[in-house]
């Protein structure tokens, strides 16, 4: 029996162990199923957030008896014909927060400005050009820097402001060591600092109010404890924003703290010293100060720098039918969408949600979500619709236009089968792929399949900062800047909003979203399907935003369909019609949505920019002899030169441009370049060139501008120009402003490229001097080997080519050519090195006098750049001084 127990006991222990392991395994599997269920099941909805209510519900009337409105005092406008519409901003440093906030608002409003470090003794910048004022408004980041100017600078600035009707905006930021109470030096105005305030209100009597709507009292504390309020008995000061002290301040001494009305912003009407000012007792971190600041700029500039009251908003809902289960819209969500749209139409005329669809994903949600899809289609006539891609694929991944067009046709067929109206002429690419950087196949397919006239993107010229986003037109399609609103595919629950729900509310109530509408006349907002299911944050956001805007501003909100909206945009900003192409490889986001079949290695490393008739073709020829240097392919339409940056070719895009260059075998050692001699004197080329090729080297060749003018005239005669054939050179260069148009056109092409200093200054505005090589064309003609040595060193080309052995002077041609075996040479075409009669003395004397000042400015410029003046320039200046 004992032996049997010894055998059975281990067996029973083994079964017990197995049972325990089985229970543990079952528990783990159960927990796994539970975790999967919890993660994939829809979350239990908390009560949906309610949008902002009517203005009338936001607090009671302000403290004290209401003041009757005061008739606005007459405003002295700036001398509009005598001042430039430019704001002069004095900042504490290039990195000060308030200074950056001031500049950001000016940039967002598209106002021109100039920043200067707040001057020390005698450092006031030049304020006038002869009798013309340079600035229409002066802003001081630190008011005390203005108040404490030395007597000479203060008198200079104040006299300028009085004479030209220029106003001043100043900010007073209290510090820890600031006096709690003090009189502002030289003004009948007292400051009380380092206060905690609450319950703010706009004074309806303030004359500067334009965008700002006078409000009822808004209860609640103002951020921070470093506020400054203003007190004065002088009639020149009118409160703009008013607050009251916090209860904790009641026990503090001083009669001002027991007053109910404490101005944080005051308007100086100019009755004290003839200068109008607006003074802020805090920075711009408080949202209402930003709003009043915009009004102050408008008022003090006589509305020369003023934002119109009209605002156009379009709300796109991307990814209709797209989205994983549990995040899509259901029937109740669609009903809420319709209800909110109708409510918004009472506040924003013609407001309509704009729905972008990808038909492939129709009915791919849960049963409830599929019913939501059907509900959207049932009410399809209530919305506007635009196409995404059929399968939500990014267009830049399609390298074949026909395949891309086939995807679009699938989406179009889906729309036809379900009765979706698609006649808006608008489309949006998933992830904005192919819109910018340009994917030409997308634009062509859009036009052929859908007849698209308008699209939008957040990527031009870059995503951040948003205030720099702009529109452009390419291939007949208008591209509008698209704005984000803080809602993305993953932001679907109010209490899980990144940074907390207060972050979303802060954006709506005076933050980024509010400022987007305030500072942009046209806003196209990107939202997503998932923002209208779940907690319906899209509905909450835009209803709250519209109501808040109507509470605090006088903006006239309205909606237009995409095509008239785009037409309106380019009426307002015609200068944006032409794009500014940039290097896609300089922006990671751009590179991610750019075809992998394209490479920035095909962009040139240097440009030969001219001017014409100075020897640039010879340099092009000599450089092409170098094994590490490769020129662009010749253009069949523009005299072999590409002429991309200065003409209609620019609008064909960078794909067209790069097709003129081979893919280098070694991008680090191979040098691609192009020569277009018309670039030098073009007003647009330096900016365009620097945008696309910011690191490119620039080579220019200068000869005596009189000789260049004569050479161009002879060039035109050789090509049969009837004006050059029928007029002498002297008649051309001395023609009056009343001369025939074609004669004056030839005159300009002879003379204007010779304004060397003017054109070089333009290039130096966009390129650092270290990237610009100014060659002596006369030296190039006499000693090309030495000139080519300079160029090779400038470019950093290896291996170094000895042009003394490579080039040979051709006696018959009268020019330097490539030396070949057997004493032969290979030279430029017969049109180069052409001989013609010497210039007549009358023309020579005329041009010497005509170019005297231009040559003098060139000499000064070369001296500043540390470059020696060429021999021809020294000779010209000597002759001019002798004459």
UniProtKB/Swiss-Prot annotation:
Cellular compartment(s): Golgi apparatus membrane
Tissues in which the UniProt entry reports expression: Widely expressed in adult and throughout development.
Chief site of localization: Golgi
Residues of this chain annotated as glycosylated in UniProt: 233, 350, 400, 666, 726, 802
Gene Ontology terms: biological process: glycosaminoglycan biosynthetic process; heparan sulfate proteoglycan biosynthetic process; heparin proteoglycan biosynthetic process; mast cell mediated immunity; regulation of angiotensin levels in blood
Report which reactions are catalysed by this protein.
Answer: alpha-D-glucosaminyl-[heparan sulfate](n) + 3'-phosphoadenylyl sulfate = N-sulfo-alpha-D-glucosaminyl-[heparan sulfate](n) + adenosine 3',5'-bisphosphate + 2 H(+)
Stretches the record annotates as Disordered: 49-82
Listed transmembrane segments: 19-39
Task: Extract the ranges annotated as region (Heparan sulfate N-sulfotransferase 2).
Answer: 598-883
Query: What start-end ranges are recorded for coiled-coil regions in this protein?
Result: none
* Positions contributing to 3'-phosphoadenylyl sulfate binding: 613-617, 711, 832-836
**Gene Ontology molecular function: any one:** heparan sulfate N-deacetylase activity
Q: For side Cytoplasmic, which residue ranges?
A: 1-18
Bias (Pro residues):
65-77
Result of knocking out the encoding gene? Mice are viable and fertile but have fewer connective-tissue-type mast cells; mast cells that remain having an altered morphology and severely reduced amounts of stored histamine and mast cell proteases.
Q: Which residues lie on this side of the membrane: Lumenal?
A: 40-883
Superkingdom of this entry's organism? Eukaryota
UniProt keywords (A-Z) are:
Disulfide bond, Glycoprotein, Golgi apparatus, Hydrolase, Membrane, Multifunctional enzyme, Signal-anchor, Transferase, Transmembrane, Transmembrane helix
Q: Which PANTHER family match?
A: BIFUNCTIONAL HEPARAN SULFATE N-DEACETYLASE_N-SULFOTRANSFERASE 2, HEPARAN SULFATE SULFOTRANSFERASE
The entry describes its oligomerization and partners as:
Monomer.
Q: What does this protein do?
A: Essential bifunctional enzyme that catalyzes both the N-deacetylation and the N-sulfation of glucosamine (GlcNAc) of the glycosaminoglycan in heparan sulfate. Modifies the GlcNAc-GlcA disaccharide repeating sugar backbone to make N-sulfated heparosan, a prerequisite substrate for later modifications in heparin biosynthesis. Plays a role in determining the extent and pattern of sulfation of heparan sulfate. Required for the exosomal release of SDCBP, CD63 and syndecan.
**What is the recorded name of this protein?**
Bifunctional heparan sulfate N-deacetylase/N-sulfotransferase 2
The source organism is Mus musculus
Gene name tied to this protein: Ndst2
